[in-house]
């Protein structure tokens, strides 16, 4: 005779079919959302629309191993044109780079050039990660291009990761982020700035030299970036301000400081703007 009490215990111990169905449904939903989140995270940090020429880790090694060059310091201006875009190309020779929130004195003859770098809002909030002499002012990886400065040396790169930013905080270096214009010889799929204005960029050549390039006339960001790519620059990041701010001293000592740049010194946000300063070593 079947043991009725044992059968009753087994029936009570089993889960109803509807309970199992709910558990499978919940597990499936969790798995789907987990995969979706993982894919989005991967696309955000890795699938950024352009290939990368130098990883942040390699740039860290390069920056840490840089040695002071021999020879005099100078910024040499050359002019050229490509794809109908007229360019001023500032070649940097053995300069000492720094990032500062104080616009330099143009009477200081050690200053060879300076220009604006990162953007900020009308309320003075920086857009993109910013580190000045080891002090982190802002953490924001929305912009893919970056520039890192340590011991007067400078590198640029393209990455969503902030490894280099953290390294600059630890090493009392400086760092800012900006829009990417060219990455590994490729243009990004789209640009977020529209209209025609005078443009400026910090770019790296195929033989690993850094230059600052400015347009001589108002250009769209796409036309400017395409001209940089066509000219042969491997990587390039945007510099805000164009020719409306900044200063340049020619090798013969002649200073160039436009009326627009002079007017900018009285801007209400003076003291907030981060400046890339290039000095004699």
Residue ranges and their predicted role:
Residues 97-99, 145-150, 202, 276:
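Broad, structure-driven detector of short, well-ordered beta-strand segments within folded domains
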Residues 115-116, 121-189:
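Active-site-adjacent helix-turn-beta-strand microarchitecture at beta-sheet edges
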Residues 124-141, 192-195, 204, 208-235, ...:
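Conserved, well-ordered active-site substructure
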Residues 173-213:
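Flexible, glycine-rich surface segments
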């Amino acid at each position: 005779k079947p043991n009725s009490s044992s059968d009753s215990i087994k029936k009570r111990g089993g889960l109803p079919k509807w309970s199992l169905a709910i558990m499978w449904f919940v597990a499936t939903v969790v798995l789907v959302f987990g995969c979706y989140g993982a894919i989005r995270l991967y696309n955000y940090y890795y699938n950024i629309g352009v290939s990368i020429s130098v990883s942040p880790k390699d740039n860290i090694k390069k920056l840490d191993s840089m040695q002071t060059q021999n020879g005099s310091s100078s910024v040499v201006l050359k002019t050229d044109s490509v794809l109908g875009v007229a360019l001023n190309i500032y070649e940097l020779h053995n300069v000492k780079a720094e990032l500062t929130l104080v616009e330099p004195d143009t009477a200081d003859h050690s200053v060879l050039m300076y220009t604006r770098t990162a953007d900020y809002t009308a309320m003075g909030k920086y857009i993109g990660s910013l580190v000045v002499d080891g002090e982190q002012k802002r953490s924001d990886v929305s912009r893919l291009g970056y520039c890192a400065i340590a011991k007067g040396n400078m590198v640029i790169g393209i990455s969503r990761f902030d490894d280099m930013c953290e390294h600059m905080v630890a090493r009392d270096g400086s760092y800012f982020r900006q829009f990417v214009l060219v990455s590994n010889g490729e243009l990004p799929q789209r640009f977020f700035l529209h209209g025609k204005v005078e443009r400026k960029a910090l770019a790296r050549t195929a033989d690993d030299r850094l230059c600052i390039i400015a347009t001589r006339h108002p250009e769209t960001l796409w036309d400017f970036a395409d001209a940089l790519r066509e000219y042969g620059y491997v990587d390039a990041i945007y510099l805000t301000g164009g020719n409306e701010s900044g200063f340049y001293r020619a090798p013969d000592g002649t200073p160039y400081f436009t009326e627009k740049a002079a007017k900018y010194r009285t801007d209400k946000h003076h003291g907030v703007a981060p400046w890339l300063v290039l000095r004699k070593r």
